[in-house]
Amino acid sequence: MYKRQGLGEPLCWIAFGPLATAAALIVISPKSNFDAIPWGTALIVGAGPAMATTLVLFCSHFHQINQDAAVGKKSPLVVLGTNRAANFLPWLVGLIFLLELLPVLNGVWPITTLMCLISLPSGLDLIKLIKRHHNKPELIKNSKFSALRFQTINGLCLSIGFATSYFFL
């Protein structure tokens, strides 16, 4: 019933963002209080990394947009087309960094989490690849791996930033 409706990316963000982060926060909480799910904290902590995960799904469809459209899928790429999706990609990568920068600027995250900026060159490489070859399936078929590289570096550096913040207090 809900297949092929273009809900994969939003559901991916919700599942890997607020839901997964809220579950992790509940598990590490010193008290078991399931009545007070920390949705605000989960949203702040999980939004950027979840958007990076969603980016992998978004980029995995560039090479198969014609096949997706032929079977009636309404993925964001089918709806936007490859050119508009390629032009949207820099905004998506920028949003990831914004979602990871705002908690630092607001004093919620330690400054060491800015290590996530190390992933910027990988994000720029992904943007260049897709902008240059968005309509050439044979050249873009590995874009999901470039997106995965960005997501991995971004998440790893963010995690290291959180882990090392203790040493810089």
Please provide the spans of the model-predicted regions:
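Intramembrane alpha-helical segments
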Residues: 2-33
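C-terminal ends of transmembrane helices
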Residues: 3-5, 57, 61, 65-66, ...
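Interfacial loop-to-transmembrane junctions
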Residues: 11, 126-155
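Membrane-embedded alpha-helical segments that form the functional core of polytopic membrane enzymes
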Residues: 35-59
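Solvent-exposed interhelical
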Residues: 50-94
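Juxtamembrane boundary at the C-terminal end of a transmembrane helix
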Residues: 160-169
